[in-house]
Design a protein with these regions (language model features):
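Divalent metal-coordination and catalytic microenvironments
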Residues: 11, 27, 32, 58, ...
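Histidine/acidic-residue-rich catalytic or RNA/ligand-binding cores of hydrolases
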Residues: 76-79, 121, 202, 238-244, ...
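Active-site gating loops and adjacent loop-to-helix segments of metal-dependent hydrolytic enzymes
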Residues: 72-92, 101-104, 147-164, 197-210, ...
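Metal-associated gating/positioning segment near the N- to mid-region
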Residues: 59-132, 148-151, 212, 241-244
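His/Asp/Glu-enriched, well-ordered alpha-helical/loop segment
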Residues: 223, 302-388
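Active-site metal-binding motif and surrounding structural segment of the metallo-beta-lactamase
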Residues: 42-62
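Active-site microenvironment of metallo-dependent hydrolases
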Residues: 1-25, 30-31, 35, 40, ...
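Histidine/acidic residue-rich metal-binding segments in metalloenzymes
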Residues: 123, 173-270, 279, 284-288, ...
Length: 454
């Protein structure tokens, strides 16, 4: 698709800065950037025959959304075993390119893919930037740093080396070596799995990194102009990540006042990623999730959201992230649900939630002042929505309402269908049975009674 000079007229502009909507405001996009807004935009376009007009009357014009937590390489696994043992590097690379196109169709023009299989996210980012693959702007991490105890996979993680999205590091020398290796191969961020599940402990994840280890990660990465993001699903991990110098904290589950104070003092940003938990809590029964977990997920959202409301009031930068890439968050489907959850659970206004998904998201893209707002000089990433998301934030989830997606000043084809993906049997765990076939399960009471008389 070629770069176009575009004048969008008649729409109501939400510019992403947090300012109120501006009715009937023109936006001029020229040479891949936002050049002017309002009457000056119309005047400048009038003398340029190369400008094509888009009539957005009755629609909302806003920056393309930024999803700050995606996993485009994962292939939508139903569980860790599929993710770890049913993926190949070449196929996952091709699938991630397919996924990138779906992301754009959902009105998301930028993503931060924090950890990935192999080093695919870095390669996908470069393929998109070089025009080989159609997709959103990307910032990429490599494989997450993990102790043997990190994450949710437990014993599936090998004791040494890499497993799927993770690389095990046992001491500070290994951490430094792996950070330097990832930076050598082009990552924008280093991700650390600060918490994990321990088989002998019941309940939520626990912190599995020492403070000194976390500080060493940050010092090493920051010396090489690379930011650090942490998976933190308890209060202690959030507190120590902030104190250690982490730039962005995912989840911040069960955050308490002490952890919040550390976040405020450090200037770290938060990306709660409620969407995955919300989908499990609200729809898990429809996809066979364990019933006893559904209310646990909802409780985690509610407890964490109460503290996020305090964080928002304290001026903490909050980003939106969907954790797209799992079976419960398939690519292209749920990117904008995080805005709905910020409104419903954290108490934000729709306008505040949009700011989290646009201007604030530029932080994850390492492009503050470049992306995320409709202001003169910003990159021309724009979406046009049929309706007003300030009246109902949920319309941003309805792809049929997205009438235009403009990425890097280029209009994205929204009409040509993307071929439907079929899932290969080799990608999935195939169960012979969901539970043991006992005789009492197989036979009726009458069968058992007759057999007892034989």
């Amino acid at each position: 698709m070629k770069l176009e000079n575009l004048l969008i007229t008649g729409g109501t502009v939400i510019d992403g800065t947090g300012a109120g909507p501006r009715a009937d405001t023109a936006v001029l996009l020229r040479d891949g950037v936002v050049e002017q807004l309002g009457a000056p935009a119309v005047q400048a376009a009038a003398t340029d025959p190369s400008v094509h007009e888009i009539d957005a009357t009755g629609r909302t014009v806003m920056p393309g959304m930024i999803d700050a937590h995606t996993h485009l390489t994962f292939g939508e696994p139903t569980g860790n075993d599929e993710l770890f043992f049913h993926r190949t590097e070449a196929y996952s690379s091709m699938l991630s390119a397919y996924n990138a196109k779906k992301v754009l169709r959902a009105g998301v023009t930028s993503v931060f893919d924090a950890d990935c299989l192999w080093n695919i996210a870095v390669e996908l980012r470069d393929a998109i930037e070089n025009g080989i693959v159609e997709g959103p702007r990307m910032r990429a991490g490599g494989q997450a740093l993990m102790t043997s105890l990190g994450g949710t996979a437990g014993r599936l993680i090998r004791d040494e080396g890499a497993t799927a999205y993770a690389t095990v590091v046992h001491d500070q020398d290994m951490m430094v070596k792996e950070i330097r290796r990832q930076i050598k191969y082009g990552v924008d961020w280093i991700k650390v799995m600060v918490t994990g599940l321990i088989p002998s402990m019941k309940g939520p994840e626990v912190k599995v990194w020492s403070f000194d280890e976390m500080r060493r990660v940050c010092d090493t990465a920051h010396e090489l102009n690379t930011k650090v993001v942490g998976h933190c699903r308890n209060a202690l991990s959030t507190r120590d990540a902030a104190r250690a110098g982490f730039d962005l904290i995912y989840h911040s589950s069960y955050m308490d006042d002490e952890a919040l104070e550390a976040v405020v003092e450090s200037g770290a940003a938060l990306c709660p990623t409620f969407t995955l938990l919300g989908n499990l809590a609200d729809y898990g029964a429809k996809i066979g999730s364990a019933p006893e977990l559904l209310e646990v997920f909802r409780a985690e959202i509610e407890v964490t959201a109460a503290m996020l409301s305090k964080a928002h009031a304290a001026g903490v930068k909050i980003l939106t992230g969907s954790e797209t890439g799992f079976a419960v968050t398939p690519v292209g489907e749920w990117h904008a649900r995080e805005l709905e959850m910020l409104v419903d659970y954290v108490g934000m206004s729709p306008l505040e939630a949009i700011t989290c998904a646009t201007a604030n998201g530029a932080f994850a893209m390492r492009a503050e002042g470049i992306l995320g707002t409709l202001e003169a000089g910003r990159q021309a990433d724009v979406i046009v929505i049929d309706g007003n998301p300030l009246d109902d934030i949920r319309i941003l989830q309805d792809k049929s309402r997205i009438s235009e997606v403009i990425s890097r000043g280029r209009r994205i084809d929204l009409l040509t269908p993307i071929p439907e993906r079929t899932v290969s049997p080799t990608e999935q765990v195939r169960f012979l049975a969901a539970c043991p076939l006992t005789r009492s399960l197989a036979l009726t009471e009458d069968d058992l009674e007759r057999l007892s008389r034989v």
